[in-house]
UniProtKB/Swiss-Prot annotation:
GO cellular component, one term: periplasmic space
Listed GO MF terms: hydrolase activity; metal ion binding
Stated family: Belongs to the sulfatase family.
Active site (UniProt): C95 (nucleophile)
PROSITE patterns named in the record: SULFATASE_1 (PS00523)
Localisation per UniProt entry: Periplasm
Cofactor note (record): Binds 1 Ca(2+) ion per subunit.
EC number: 3.1.6.-
Protein name, as recorded: Ulvan-active sulfatase
Source organism of the structure: Formosa agariphila (strain DSM 15362 / KCTC 12365 / LMG 23005 / KMM 3901 / M-2Alg 35-1)
Enzyme class, broadest EC rank: hydrolase
Length: 498
């Protein structure tokens, strides 16, 4: 395989300038064309592509990923009929930034959407541009949460629809059915569910034995509130599975075998807003009859930024060099080849309901993972400025995350749930130093606002009065009266395109 660039930012279609530190980007043209010829009977015509994206669901909460307590028969059946990926990632465990990667093939720092409720840069080309040029109709059916419209120009777009007796709107099944029945040209459709994202179902009298616990939440076994919330979440997962079942019935009724169907979820809920694997690792299952071997598994690192390059190659095109992602088409075709040697993660923690100043960056290969928390208690003093009002919010952010150290290093082979920090262990010094070097090289190539030797800590905001300001109350955090409205425009880095 001519793999494109090997570096990628951690981790449902798609999120880099040339990244020198991550390895050479290759074109994938010649070897992939050979593999395409091998599969010519299956993809001699452009296949239809459907990407189903759930909302806020842990990779650990599926039957096919080992949780026998949750009911996910439709996803489990897809895995049985296709391929299950064990190392698929998004770069940000939050809605808009995660989706922006799928749709652009670029990490959030490069595409501009690196905080929630913000927009992609207006000069970015998305899936709607790239796939249209390759002869596809590009459709969004369900939740969007991406902007601006000039970047995301869907050929057809249908909003979620209200449904009685359930906590969230449904995907637009009637519109999907009518479209699939009458489709005249190849299409790329994103079906974006609002499940299982809260508000969850109200489950009466749940028991701890109904829930599967993991090292990151086993201390909650006697927490009645947690158990009730988790039971409602499991029930919401079932409701999403019901919608997925209906979609698959429509696909099997109206479409040929020449249809690639991918299921994923935008990020985990247990690690939401973090760069831990419980937030960034995502479920990723694909079915493509006559191309994907049923019941197969891949342990290769793939990333949401790889989705658009893959779709473009399947459609007969070439993906541009400034995309961060690589095509994983060879994996779908049964070849065990490396797509990425790294994936990366971003944590902003500003412009959200619980806004605090606590940015993080992460780099991960198949075994080791390094995290830098730039405003930890350990280093907060060096982040302070000559402005008392700014310093209050810098210190507040560090205290809000007082249990998160400046550096984290994990051996994921022996510690998959990141319970034992090895950052200060001298036996891992060389591993840590290499990861640090490569992470900061990647950050520089991405145009990150953070750097290794920066002075202070950036405070970011959308222009004007929009967004969740650090010095104003939100529904989830209160600011002392004396600190309200004390920050000025000059205290912030204003992100103009937000």
């Amino acid at each position: 395989m001519n793999s494109k660039k090997t570096g990628v930012i951690i981790l449902g279609c798609i999120a880099f300038l040339h990244i020198a530190c991550s390895g050479d980007k290759k074109t994938q043209a010649q070897d992939t064309s050979d593999s395409m010829l091998e599969k010519s009977s299956a993809i001699s015509e452009k296949p239809n592509i459907i990407f189903y994206l759930a909302d806020d669901q842990d990779v650990y909460d599926y039957g096919c990923y080992g949780n026998e307590k949750v009911h996910t028969p439709a996803v489990d059946a897809l895995a049985k009929d296709g391929i299950l990926f064990t190392n698929a990632f998004t770069a940000q465990a939050i809605c808009a930034p995660s989706r922006s990667q799928l749709f652009t093939g670029k990490y959030p720092l490069k595409n501009g959407c690196f905080a929630n409720h913000t927009g992609t840069r207006s000069d970015i080309k998305s899936v709607t541009t790239h796939m249209k040029k390759l002869g596809y109709e590009v459709v969004l059916a369900g939740k969007s949460h991406v902007k601006p419209e000039n970047v995301y120009q869907w050929d057809r777009e249908w909003e979620p629809v209200p449904k009685q007796g359930v906590p969230r709107d449904y995907i637009p099944l009637d519109s999907i059915a009518a479209y699939l029945k009458n489709a005249k040209k190849p299409f790329c459709m994103f079906i974006t569910s609002k499940y299982p994202h809260g508000k969850y179902f109200d489950v009466e009298h749940p028991k701890a034995s109904d829930i599967k616990f993991y090292p990151f939440n086993e201390n909650k076994k006697t927490d009645k509130t947690f158990i009730k919330t988790k039971a409602g979440y499991y029930r919401s997962i079932e409701e999403d599975n019901t919608q997925l079942e209906e979609v698959l019935k429509l696909v099997d009724t109206y479409l040929t075998d020449n249809t690639l169907f991918i299921y994923s979820a935008d990020h985990g809920v247990s690690g939401k807003f973090t760069v831990k694997d419980i937030g960034l690792k995502v479920p990723f299952v694909a079915r493509w009859p006559k191309v994907i071997k049923p019941g197969s598994t891949s342990n290769q690192l793939i990333h949401y930024t790889d989705v658009l390059p893959t779709f473009m190659e399947i459609a007969g095109g070439k993906f541009p060099e400034d995309m961060d992602g690589n095509s994983f088409l060879p994996l779908l075709q049964g070849k065990d080849v490396e797509v990425n040697n790294y994936v990366y993660g971003v944590r902003t923690n500003q412009n959200i309901l619980n806004s605090e100043i606590f940015p993080s960056r992460m780099i991960r290969d198949k075994r080791y993972k390094y995290i830098r928390n730039f405003n930890s208690i350990e280093v907060v003093e060096q982040n302070l400025t000559g402005k008392p009002n700014v310093n209050y919010f810098i210190e507040r952010g560090a205290k809000a995350h007082k249990n998160e150290p400046f550096e984290e290093l994990y051996d994921l082979q022996n510690d998959p749930f990141e319970q034992h920090n090895l950052a200060s262990n001298p036996d891992y010094k060389s591993i840590k130093e290499k990861l640090i070097k490569d992470m900061f090289s990647w950050m520089k190539a991405q145009g990150d606002i953070l750097s290794e030797n920066m002075i202070g800590i950036p405070i970011i905001t959308p222009k004007g009065n929009r967004g969740f300001k650090l010095d104003q109350d939100t529904p989830r955090r209160k600011i002392p009266e004396a600190r309200k409205n004390t920050l000025t425009k000059d205290d912030y880095i204003v992100i103009e395109h937000w």
